[in-house]
Amino acid sequence: MAHPSEVAQLGLLAKSVNNESAEFTGLSDALEKLGPIVRNSSLDHNYRKELSEDRAIWKEICDCLNGAHLDRVEEKEPRHLRMRAVRGMILLGRNLSVENQRLPQELALHSRVVELLAQVQCQYDEMEIALHKAAYELLYNLTRASATFDQQSLGNVCRALRYPLGAHGSRDLALPVSLYFLNMVRDDEFLFAFLKHPDADKIVYQFMLQGVIKNHTELFDVIDNKTHDLENLSSLGAIQMSIWSCLVTHASFSPYLERLESHNWEAFDTILRFAQLVVTSSEKWDKEQLTAITVWAFRIFESTASSVEEYTRRGIDDEAEASRLHQKLLVVLDILSVFSKYESIRKFIMFYNGVEVLINTLRYLQNHCMRINFTKAKSNMAATFKAYNSNYERVEDEGKIKSIINIETSSIKSTNFPECKSLIIEILGFLTYKNREVQDKCRELHGLELVLSNCVIDDNDPFIKERSIMCIRFLLEDNAENQSFVAQLEAKKAVNDDVLAEAGYEVKVGADGKIGLTKNPRAAVEDKMDLNLT
């Protein structure tokens, strides 16, 4: 149904906006006539639907935006009036796009809007911010069904997305920008190009993470180990989690992280820790998504493992370097330990020689790290501790102790790589479970002895004893060679009988005098790992 009156009024406004003269007096009159059209399109569903199906209406909106010239320098009053008029047209488009996305897509309205926003000489006054808010809402509606990404408009899209950086964390902009960005990152082609764009860091790190997530959601509380229920996120928090789910599962995320680490450690570290939260807080990943995440996590693990080897070989403690290595290692090991319950990921790790990398890294950490045992502090007394080297000899050297423990806070420093060995052994446990190839490889690479040597309580690696015992159980299960190997170690008193008992085995001497292991039917072995492997 045609609406000649509305078309004429919109045409008059478009001409007024596009007029080069800042003194054009018809703009105020045209604005007054636009007001009722915008209001009725918001309140009257039938009217809104009728207008949305009128191609001439959409054409007038496009013509207005095309010639708005918001890049010109004007006095405050005419600039305000021109922006108010453009905002009115955008609000009308926003209302109509609820009903119809086909016509504005055919007229390339998306590209026209982001081109308009790219022209703005940013002053961040009230009307300018209001115009952007309306524009983001329109862009969200236009991209709900499809992002219809145009490669040539990437620069304008990025400029539009980075605008809120100058708005001092405006919450008014946070929600509409996040909704629009979510629609865009669901498009593989856009995300592939976006993560290579120079503005990606500003948008992803400075605006989305530091601006929106840190200032307007509860998600940083989780990263900072504060209590929060991820099941009851705010709308903005849930939207950001959806955005990041798209980012971390895209093939371009891995090279993006590599580039980011090379020039901005702080941004890389924050993004990596937030990616860890996103990845490990959901079990709804499909096989393709699991693989995409594992690709970047495993690459970081491989490169970090190599750096850890070099660091430990030097034998010189460097807290700054150790802190970075430890932080990276902790994040990716946590992700791999969570994902190792999936068969496809276990196969991925094995295919890319992950067992070798895990065992070698465990060996370097075993030789480098001290075992720590804290005793609970009594009232008005500091906690005491004992430190042991890799040969389980007591360490008394005060300098060495201070290099790994903060005496004042009784906390372990990154130079001792806390929790890393425990996570490696947990991953090995998953890989070894009912897998003869991994069982044998662990023996051949002398990983069996490494796991056995960690069947002790160590405050540097919480739960390492329980995880090691469970891993030993899986290494020995239905594997005569491994059982014989451990039996020979036990005969040399290299293995604690209690460890074998907890793993469900006991040493027996056969009639031929040979030492072997047998399952102890009376041993109650409690599973301390999630063995619901899929």
Curated annotation (Swiss-Prot):
- Annotated compartments: Cytoplasm
Q: What is its main location?
A: cytoplasm
Q: Does the keyword Iron apply?
A: no
- Please give the GO cellular component terms listed in this UniProt entry: cytosol
Q: Which UniProt keywords apply?
A: Cell cycle, Cell division, Cytoplasm
> Is Disulfide bond among this UniProt entry's keywords?
no
Q: Which residues cross the membrane?
A: none
For biological process, the GO terms are: cell division
Q: Which family does it belong to?
A: Belongs to the ataxin-10 family.
**What's its job?**
May play a role in the regulation of cytokinesis.
Indicate what this protein is called per its UniProt record.
Answer: Ataxin-10 homolog
The organism of origin for this protein: Eremothecium gossypii (strain ATCC 10895 / CBS 109.51 / FGSC 9923 / NRRL Y-1056)
Organism classification: Eukaryota, Fungi, Dikarya, Ascomycota, Saccharomycotina
